A protein has these predicted regions:
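Glycine-centered hinge/linker elements that transmit conformational signals in sensory
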Residues: 1-24
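Non-transmembrane alpha-helical segments in soluble domains
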Residues: 5-12, 31, 35, 53, ...
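Mature extracytoplasmic/periplasmic domains
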Residues: 31-32, 36, 47-51, 66, ...
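Alpha-to-beta junction loops
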Residues: 36-45, 59
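Pocket-flanking alpha-helical
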Residues: 49-55, 196-199
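Ligand-binding "clamshell"
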Residues: 52-75
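Periplasmic solute-binding protein
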Residues: 75-90, 164-174
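Conserved C-terminal helix/tail region of periplasmic/extracytoplasmic solute-binding proteins
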Residues: 148-203
Length: 203
C-alpha cells in the first residue's frame, strides 16, 4: 500500500504530464517523449525495443526493475509474463488441426522458424529458442544469471479483468487530480474490494 503509493506519486509528480491531466496522456505520446529525449524513464515492455532502438540506438536503452522499497526487491529481476497462449480450434477440420500443429512444431524446432520467432517476437519457451537481438531480453537474462528472481505476472488470472481494471484506473485518475489520503483509500478499495467483488462474480 505505502510502497505502491510512493511509486505512483513518483510517476505522477515527475511526469511530463500534469498529474491533474494524467488521464489524457497516451502511450504514443510517452513513446515520442522518450525518443525525443524529453523523458528518461518509460515503463513499458520488450515490444517497445524496435521503436526505441531505432530512434535512440540499442546501446542507449536499458530495462531495469521498478524499485518501491519492498523487502527483498534488491534481488528482483524484471517483471515477466504473458497473457497469450497458443491454441488449436477443436471445431476446425481434422486437416486444419493437423496443419496448425505442424506449423507450431515448425515454429519452435526448425532453423527458419526459430530464427523468425527470435527476430520478430523475442525468445520463446522452448529448448531450441534462439537469442534475440532485443537488448531488453538480454537485460532480463543478465539479472536472472546474477541470481535475481523473476517477477511473474499473468493478467489472465485477474477476475473480470476489464471491469477490475476500469475500477482501478478510475480511482487512480481521481487520485491524480487530488492526491489526498481519502482518494488513496479509494484506490486501495478499488484493488482489494474490487478484486473480491469480481472474483465472487466469476466463481
Amino acid at each position: 500500500n505505502t510502497e505502491f503509493r510512493n511509486i505512483w506519486d513518483l510517476y505522477l509528480n515527475n511526469s511530463t504530464t500534469d498529474p491533474v491531466a494524467n488521464n489524457t496522456a497516451t502511450g504514443d505520446a510517452a513513446e515520442a517523449e522518450m525518443k525525443e529525449g524529453k523523458a528518461v524513464f518509460y515503463q513499458n515492455g520488450t515490444w517497445e525495443y524496435d521503436a526505441l532502438s531505432g530512434a535512440l540506438g540499442a546501446e542507449s536503452i536499458q530495462m531495469i526493475p521498478i524499485y518501491m522499497g519492498v523487502a527483498g526487491e534488491e534481488k528482483a529481476g524484471l517483471a515477466s509474463g504473458t497473457e497469450n497462449c497458443w491454441a488449436v480450434n477443436k471445431n476446425a477440420s481434422e486437416a486444419d488441426q493437423k496443419a496448425t500443429l505442424d506449423f507450431m512444431k515448425w515454429v519452435v524446432t526448425s532453423e527458419e522458424g526459430t530464427t523468425m520467432m527470435a527476430e520478430q517476437f523475442g525468445p520463446i519457451p522452448f529448448k531450441s529458442a534462439k537469442t534475440p537481438a532485443n537488448v531488453f531480453f538480454a537485460d532480463a537474462n543478465a539479472l536472472l544469471a546474477a541470481g535475481n528472481y523473476n517477477v511473474d505476472w499473468a493478467f489472465n488470472a485477474t477476475p473480470n479483468v476489464d471491469e477490475f481494471r476500469a475500477g482501478v484506473v478510475s480511482a487512480l485518475q481521481a487520485y491524480g487530480k487530488e492526491q489526498t489520503d481519502d482518494n488513496w483509500a479509494k484506490v486501495v478499495s478499488a484493488i482489494v474490494d474490487g478484486w473480491a467483488v469480481q472474483y465472487a462474480a466469476t466463481h
